[in-house]
UniProtKB/Swiss-Prot annotation:
Gene: gltX2
Origin species: Pseudothermotoga lettingae (strain ATCC BAA-301 / DSM 14385 / NBRC 107922 / TMO) (Thermotoga lettingae)
Catalytic activity: tRNA(Glu) + L-glutamate + ATP = L-glutamyl-tRNA(Glu) + AMP + diphosphate
Name assigned to this protein: Glutamate--tRNA ligase 2
Record localization: Cytoplasm
Taxonomic classification: Bacteria, Thermotogati, Thermotogota, Thermotogae, Thermotogales
Record-listed ATP binding positions: K237
Amino acid sequence: MTVRLRFAPSPTGYLHVGGARTALFNWLYARKMNGKFVLRIEDTDLQRSTKESEKAIIESLKWCGIDWDEGPDIGGDFGPYRQSERVSEGIYKRYAQILVEKQCAYYTVYDKVDRKKVLFNTFEYPEEYEKKGHDITISFRVPEGITKFHDLLKGNMEFQNSVIGDFVIVKSDGFPTYNFAVVIDDYLMRITHVFRGEDHLSNTPKQIMIYKALGWEIPQFMHIPLILGFDRTPLSKRHGATSVEHFRKIGILNMGLMNYLALLGWSVGEEEVFDVKEKLVNFEPESISNKGVIFDPEKLEWVNGKHMRMINIEQLWNEFVEWIKFTNRKIPHCEESYALKVLNVCREKVNTLSQLYDFSYSFFFDDYTLEERFVSEYLSTSYAKEILRKAVVLFSELKDWSIEGTEKVCRALADMKIASKNKVFQLLRGAVTGKLVTPGLFETLSILGKKRVIERFEKLLNSVDC
């Protein structure tokens, strides 16, 4: 038997990090078992579903590094992979009628004026009432007894059927409800394992009843604890941004996000920083924690920073350029060798691509702004002009433009005792970058190059505020 798993988002907004983690766990198990991973779009909510959201979700999944073997964009043997298209083909209607014929479901006719008022239930199709414009739904008859199933994470579960009560499976507009459509789709797409958030746990007995009524084999279920905010309630917009799109925009690497999401409930020994794809063989569904986990943006940034320093510098440059394009920022135009030097020294002090962009900006562009503290504490002093004048002279005479060479000039300027060494170094640092926190001063000067450094000193000397 081929193991088959799926991720089935509703296209009503951006991909939530909780959804991304669910997709990741499904993907990990499918790949580990040499099975198939299916993407299905559950777009039966006509008022909220949009093509724009579907496109955004697919783009976010691809960016996360999650690929699929079948889906709405690539097709497959068990399509269509959009529920709205499956409605058009009459798939759900066909199985709803089978349930009615077996008297496992029934039609409900509603009053034309008070559309919530039930007139009667029947196993016979009320064609006459349909012609008169009455709303008609199909509801599932919940049998007596207890519904039991084994959850891979939570163990043996049971629900009293009497507490659940009959439920609608086809709405008056002809569209299936979630609990009905998901059973039909999972069965016809031959899904063997259903991994999803524990907020779906209460839906499971309803779905199992439908499986049994149709005489179908039931897949294995696993319900994953939800990601929580710091107040231990399910992570939502009130806790701040929660979409994959947001974290991509602020400069989180896909490998950093996937690593962190994997840590939310799954562990690989003592390791906290790893490439998720390299840990496929270690993934065991039963090893996922059965407790809710808190989403910590600071820990995410920490993990991401580790990845930024782990990957080779060429890969970081490629990620950096793609992120700049994605966020529509100004692209550096320089030799790649120069860019690699800049990123190599700057990545040590940052944890996101956004921070890297801001931190490295003055290496790539001349229109950087001067920090207020630099201006007030160093540039607007009585000694600033004298040091900058002497810096222009000494750096112009420097033949050995290297880390060692620039260090000698900086120390020579400090030895003149015009100001303390710290004040001299901070003035020079701010003069060429606009910042008081940068990579090492001598390394910064060496990378920027003689021409750019002298031009920046001269520009400040000619400024009004200096």
